[in-house]
């Protein structure tokens, strides 16, 4: 579950998001996935909207493919109509935990990195908290004696406190002791 629906459609496909697919081979992988699930008589669901997500009875499906945006999911601060990372984690565990052999689930807070790349500290911090909520949700749903949960980063970006901000300055603001740097460019505290 996540974003990236455009990568599953060909350029001429009629898509849920009114966008052109990006597949150069013109395959509609979502239709192929649905056809395979139907052919194998599997209980499955393909989701594109938060309403579909919220209406899904997770105990009645064994296979889930949820693509809620043409590209990346929205940052949580801007998210009005997509499931949260914690909600998707919960749904995945509800489906996967019925397997008597156990399961492996990968959950990524990918928007943390995107926010760092464009110097959006508030977005990066909020996305980190969203990942924490997903971890907390996972821990609440599994037998912790039987579960190995790893939290790691594929790479990281460090935070540094820059300048000499006064105590009452938000770390998400510009340095209030010198609103511009030597070369007249404003800089964020973190």
Set out the residue ranges of the language-model regions.
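A post-motif C-terminal structural segment
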Residues: 1-190
């Amino acid at each position: 579950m996540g974003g990236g629906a455009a990568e599953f459609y060909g350029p001429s496909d009629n898509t849920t998001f009114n966008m052109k697919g990006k597949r150069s081979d013109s395959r509609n992988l979502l239709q192929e996935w649905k056809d395979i699930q139907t052919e194998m008589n599997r209980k499955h669901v393909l989701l594109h909207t938060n309403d579909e997500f919220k209406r899904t009875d997770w105990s009645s499906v064994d296979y889930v493919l949820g693509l809620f945006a043409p590209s990346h999911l929205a940052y949580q601060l801007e998210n009005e109509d997509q499931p949260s990372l914690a909600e998707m984690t919960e749904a995945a565990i509800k489906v996967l935990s019925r397997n008597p052999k156990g399961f492996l689930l990968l959950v990524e807070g990918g928007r943390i990195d995107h926010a760092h790349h464009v110097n959006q500290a508030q977005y990066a911090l909020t996305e980190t908290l969203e990942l924490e909520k997903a971890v907390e949700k996972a821990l609440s749903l599994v037998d912790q004696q039987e579960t190995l949960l790893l939290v790691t980063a594929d790479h990281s970006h460090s935070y540094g406190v820059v300048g000499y901000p006064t105590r009452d300055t938000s770390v998400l603001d510009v340095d209030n002791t010198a609103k511009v740097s030597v070369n007249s460019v404003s800089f964020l505290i973190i």
